Amino acid sequence: LKEIVRLANERAVPVIVDAAAELPPVCNLQSFLSEGADLVIFSGGKAMCGPNDTGILCGRADLIKAARAQAFPNAGIGRALKVSKEQIIGLIYALQRFIKIDWNSEQLRWEKVCEKILHRLKSINCTNISIAYATHGARPLIVPRVCLTIDPIMLGKDLSQIDHQLERGKPAIAVVMD
């Protein structure tokens, strides 16, 4: 981000960070602005657990004012995207709750869940099974995932059959195939 900010600043172009899925950790509420972003957009849904059609726009006052000019009660392009008073109250409550969560404890809880899953899956014919953190793509980065490397030949099924069987299970399991 720092390199993008440097290049954008040389050209007087504002940097807008789509941080919709960058929570947790809570420190991300400030980190992108600290690194020089001009605007940062967070989802009010997702990990914040507020109303799904809400969000938080943070950043430079002049850019916030320009965005606000597009919203209710004005007739800008954002008029159709207004949120109700009830949704705003829900978002405020969700944000207050979100910042009070002990995310270190949550992360440990997630790791324990992953360890249980990993233990239950050890009987599957796979070439590798581990707990890992995403380095790209999947968000948020602090959420651990159970990673399996499956050899379809060893299982006697192709990847689409495996995916289909997992999706139809109880509970359903969504997979990302690389």
Predicted regions, residues:
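Active-site-lining helix/loop region of Rossmann-like oxidoreductase modules
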Residues: 99-124, 129-133
